[in-house]
Amino acid sequence: MGKNLTIVMLVFVSMAGWMFGADTGSIGGITNMRDFQSRFADRYNPVTDSYSYSSARQGLITGMVNVGSFFGCFLSSPLMDRIGKRTSIMFWTIVYLIGIILQVTAVPSWVQIMVAKIWTGLSIGALSVLAPGFQSEVAPADLRGTIVTTYQLAVTGGIFIAACINMGTHKLHKTAQWRVSMGINLLWGIITFIGISFLPESPRYLISVGRDEEALQIMAKNNDLPIEHEVIQTEYHVIKSDCEAELAGGPATWPEIFGPDIRYRTFLGLGVMSLQQLTGDNYYFYYGFEVFEGTGMNSPYLSALILDAVNFGCTFGGLFVLEFFGRRMPLIIGALWQSITFFIYAAVGNRALTRKNGTSNHRAGAVMIVFSCLFIFSFAQTWGPAAYVIVGESYPIRYRSKCAAVATTGNWLWGFLISFFTPFITNSIGFKYGYIFAACNLCAACIIFLFAHETKGLTLEEINELYISGAKPWMPRPKNLGNFTKQQEEVREKSRGVQGESAAHLENVDGEEGIEDSSNDISSTTSSDGRAKPESSYHDQEEQFA
C-alpha cells in the first residue's frame, strides 16, 4: 500500500506543476499564430500582410499570469491552514479550469485574454506553494528531494508537451490554431482533480489540528507497517512534540515571519525563488520563438521544441542529483555553469550573429542554440527543482504556509518583471541582455554559498534544528543532528524481516524504549516553553542576511 500511495502522490500532486508548465510552454507559440495575431495584435503591416505586437501588449499578454500567481501565493496560505493542503489543491484546480475556459472562449478583445491569464495565475501561484509543500510533508526524509523534484519534472513535461501541441496546431485554420492548444489544458486540470481526490491528507497537518488517529493510519500505510510498530510510533511522537512546541504560541501572523525567530529562512526562501527566475530560464521559455527566429533558424517552432525537450529530459537527472549530491553544491556549480553559458551566448549574439550586410550568420546562431541547451542542461537538474525543494523543507510547521507563500511570490514577481520588460530590453540592447543574466547567476552562486544549509537526508524537524543551531552554512554539519534519522534507519533494517507478519507477533519492547529515548532527546533540546534550545544565537547570522 505504501509504494502505491507514493506513486500516486508523485503522479497526481506533481500534475499541479504540469498545469503550470503547459500554460508557460504554450503562450510563446500561441502569440505567434496567425489567427491569434489577427485578433489580439495591435499592429498590422499591409506590405508584408503580417501582424505584430507593441512591446507593452506582448508583455502584458505573456506576463499577466505571473501577476495572478503573485496574489495566488498569498491567498493559498489562509485556505490551506483552514482546510488542509489536499482539499486546497482540489479547490485551486477548479479555479484553474475556470481560467482555461475563459481563455478558450475569448472574444476578439485582448483584455479578456489578459484577465483570463490573471485568473489562471491565481491557481498556478497557489498550487506552486501547495504541491511542493504537500510532497515535502508526506515524503520520507531519504526520498524527499527526489519526490519534490517530480514537481519541476512535471513543469518541464508540461512545457514540452505544450510545445509539441503548438507544433501540430499552428498550421490549422482559424481559431483552432490556438484554441486547441489552450483547450487541451482542461485535460490536465481534470486529471489532477480526480487524482488528488484519492490522496490522503498530510500527516503533519492532521497532527497539527488534533486528528492524530487519522495521521497514524496514513503514516502506517505510507510505510507498509502496522500503527503499533516502533518506526511509526517514534516518528509520530517526534512530529507530535514538534507540532506542540511550535504551535504553543498560536497561529503565526504575517509580521512574525519577519521576526528574529524565522526571518533568516524567510529571506533565504524569497531569495532562492527570486534567483530561480533571475537565472534567465524564462527568457528562453517565454520568448524562445523570438530568440530562435532572431538567430535565423527556418523553423523557430522546431528550435523551441528542441530546447523544451532538452529541458524535460535533463530534469530526470535532477531526480538523482539532489539526493546524491545534496542541495548546496548542485546550486553553486549550476549557477557558475549557467553564468558561463549566458556570457558566451550573449557575446556570440552581440558580436557574430549579424553580418555587416545585415544577414544572419547561421553558424553563430547554431552556437547560440548549443549554449542555450547547455544552460538548460544545468538549470533543469539544479535550480529548476532545487529551489522548490529548499522552500518545501526549510520552515517549521507553525510558519510553513506563510513563509512558503512569501518565498514563492518572489518567483512570480520576477517572472512578471522579466516577461513584461524583456521585449523593451531586447529592442534596446538585443543579445547583450544575456550579460545581465550571467551576472545574476554569479550572484546566485555567492548567496547559496553564504546562506543556504545542506539539508540532504534530514527530517523536517532536524532541518529546523540545523537552522536554529547557528552553524555556518559552509562549515560541517553539527554532529548532534541526524540521530533521529539514523535511529529510524536502524529500526527499519530490523523491521524488514517482520513486515509481512501480523502485528500481534511484533515485539514492541524495544520500540517503547526507542520512543522514550527519542522523547528524552527532544526534551534535552527544548526549553520550558516547549521551544527548541539554540546551541548559540543565530540572530547575528539573520542580521547578516537581512
From Swiss-Prot:
Residues in the Extracellular compartment per record: 31-58, 109-112, 166-179, 286-301, 350-363, 426-432
Biased composition (Acidic residues): 509-519
Classification via PROSITE patterns: MFS, SUGAR_TRANSPORT_1
Classification via Gene3D superfamilies: MFS general substrate transporter like domains
Region of interest called Disordered, as start-end residue ranges on this chain: 486-546
Biased composition (Basic and acidic residues): 487-496, 530-546
A single BP term in Gene Ontology: D-glucose import across plasma membrane
PANTHER family given in the database record: HIGH-AFFINITY GLUCONATE TRANSPORTER GHT3-RELATED, PLASTIDIC GLUCOSE TRANSPORTER 4
NCBIfam families in the cross-refs: SP
Protein name as it appears in the record: High-affinity glucose transporter ght5
